[in-house]
Amino acid sequence: MSRTVFCHYQQSDAEGLDFVPYPGELGQRIFAHIGKTAWQAWLAHQTMLINENRLSPRDPKHRAFLETELQKFLFERNADKPDGYVAPLGEE
């Protein structure tokens, strides 16, 4: 049976995550307030950031950057785009 949460990202009820996706207090906040669709959107955005900025998940500075972007993306709706990013037609 799936959980329903009020997704902060989508501003509507959504299917909740099956598990805490990130360690610590931030992970608990994500689990309680973010739906599966929003989490998948973050994973795609994170992949773009890693690829375009040539980030290494092993580098503590890069991990800190990604955590900041995670919070901005899911809870503030103003995450950075890579330099020179051009959205495909039909996207914001």
Swiss-Prot record:
GO terms for cellular component: cytosol. Could be a mediator in iron transactions between iron acquisition and iron-requiring processes, such as synthesis and/or repair of Fe-S clusters in biosynthetic enzymes. The keyword 4Fe-4S does not apply. PANTHER family: FE(2+)-TRAFFICKING PROTEIN-RELATED. Keywords: Iron. Pfam families: Iron_traffic. It comes from the Bacteria. GO terms for biological process: cellular response to oxidative stress. This is Probable Fe(2+)-trafficking protein. Gene3D superfamilies: Fe(II) trafficking protein YggX (1.10.3880.10). Belongs to the Fe(2+)-trafficking protein family. The keyword Aminoacyl-tRNA synthetase does not apply. InterPro entries: Fe_traffick_prot_YggX (IPR007457), Fe_traffick_prot_YggX_sf (IPR036766).
